[in-house]
């Protein structure tokens, strides 16, 4: 329906519609190539209900991986850091380091930590990158299961603690 005419379109047979109806809550599809735009997207479908609570239908919108990448680029802590979004299957769907559409197995740090991140849902851990200690903080988005993480240099993450230590040491 790339001409804008959707009169012949029946969404009830589409997977996103069926999944939103079955889940009775917002659902996120896996990443796929949109037939019209040819861009990589994730669809978000949300059921809606009649006043009596019975299912009335579902609406769907696509999020391009480009848009998600722009949002990840804004994940910063005091202006520093790199962001990433990983889906529950281990597919990196957005990254400030150009890793979108790669699997966590291709990144040694993520490969070693991913199952723990899935299980714990949120937390942080330390790693070294390019000779600098980094803190990786992450949290799972409940509605999608996506893990959103940001890596920040340790010197930035703990700067206030370091200055507090100097203050107390000087007493």
Where are these regions (language model features)?
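Stable alpha-helical elements in mature extracytoplasmic
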Residues: 16, 68-71, 113
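Selective recognition of signaling/oligomerization transmembrane alpha-helices
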Residues: 169-171
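Tryptophan-centric aromatic hotspots in well-structured domains and transmembrane helices
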Residues: 16-19, 28, 82, 144, ...
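Extracellular/periplasmic ligand-sensing ectodomains of membrane signal-transduction proteins
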Residues: 1-41, 91-109
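Short N-terminal helix-loop-first-beta-strand/juxtamembrane motif that initiates sensory/input modules
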Residues: 22-28, 73-93, 118-126
